[in-house]
Amino acid sequence: MTNNSDHIFSNIDIRKLLIPIMLENLLASLMGTVDTMMVSNVGASAVSAVSLVDSINILVIQALSAIAAGGAILCSQYIGSSNPKGANRAARQVFLVMTVLSVFISAICLVLRVPMLKFIFGSVEAEVMADSQAYFLFTLLSFPFIGLYDAGASIMRAQKDSKSPMTISIISNFLNIGGNAVLIFGLGMGVAGAAISTLASRIFCAVIVIIKLRNSSQTICVNRYYTIRPDWDLIKRVLYIGIPSGIENSMFQFGKLAIQSTVSTLGTAAIAANAVTNILENLNGVAAQGVGIGLMTIVGQCIGAGRKDEAIYYIKKLSKMAEAAIIISCLVVFALCRPITILGGMEAESARMCFEMTLFITITKPISWVLSFIPAYGMRAAGDVKFSMITSCASMWLCRVSFTILLCRVYGFGPIAVWIGMFADWTVRGIVFSIRFHSRRWLNHHIID
């Protein structure tokens, strides 16, 4: 098919779906950069504490996001098959699952907060540990609100509404920055102030998204939340997609924790440098990640409509878009690296290491990132989640984690070892996913009636 009018999604539809997602991700990362710069003025120990705790927080956030994405894929396929009733039933179960799971995780983290931090980051300096405990206390309370927002935002995107999550996120991020300014600088609360501001902004997101989904003019309308009861068949379908993706994301974060534990032995300067580099690397990937998130909605609806050739077409099309986004983003972020380290008040040694790592990323990321991620987004939307989980976990542990630990502990490399391992992981994973995509075996799954 070469005529764009023959496709389920026109170029205009794609732009309307992707641009808000890309802008939302970009602004969130920019706000994260500003957030870190604000915290960095408190001191290197504060930056290190936020970085260490966020490696745990992101583990939880990624797991919750994967479950929500599983529900969104289910909703997308129901919408593609012209079954809005099924989409609405699935959406209600997504909210139920996310609420129960996020509250449970928050409670566990609250009870095990101190021993967990000491077990993972026991070798850090006392000041960093104290700041970490204060920061984690407030951020763990936000997990249920993250779960509710993720559920709502994913459901909105499943019905082609990516503008609403973007708007909510924009307002939330500015509230977070404003809260930081008041609590960190005005009241001198340090990392605790940053955490409280984050908690408040996430509560805002959850409340607004719940209200927004009550609109009966939408394809999916979720109201009377108190009447939601378990539908075990739908819950199993949500978890069929969500659990493998959650394990994949969680294993990825466990790997980052293992790496972070190794980096934490290199000293506060290395921890701070790697923390800022992580933010910059995330920033140069947000546009392409937005393409991947939108691709799940597109492929999900194609599969639901029984148009598998369309799914293949869109994965190829959006992979090219993601590659262009990666190249441009890497160049822009590299140009901003030195100004950010200066404005953030980083120590000279940390700034030097940060610049070197960002240069390495700018060279290597455009080579391998797209093939290792974008086709996988589409294949997961078709239900091919177990293969993605196995491939990603094996590659991450065998390449990323092993290389980093080997280079740091045996050969005496600094934090640059993290990114050498990352490049190896991306390369291997990209090769495997490319073979899987061209085999078309990922099209043989059925997750809706």
Name each model feature, range by range.
Residues S5-M37, N41-V42, I58-G70, L74, ...:
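N-terminal transmembrane alpha-helices
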Residues K16-D35, F138, S172, S201-C205, ...:
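Transmembrane helical elements of multi-pass membrane transporters/channels
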Residues N25-S29, Q62, S102, S106, ...:
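Residue-level hotspots within the lipid-embedded alpha helices of multi-pass solute transporters
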Residues A44-S55, S132, F136, A195, ...:
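Small-residue hotspots at the loop-to-helix junctions and early N-terminal turns
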Residues A68, F138-R157, P165-N173, A194-V209, ...:
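Short runs within selected transmembrane alpha-helices of multi-pass transporters and secretion channels
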Residues V47-A107, I146-P165, I271-C337, W369-C393:
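Small-residue-rich hydrophobic transmembrane alpha-helices
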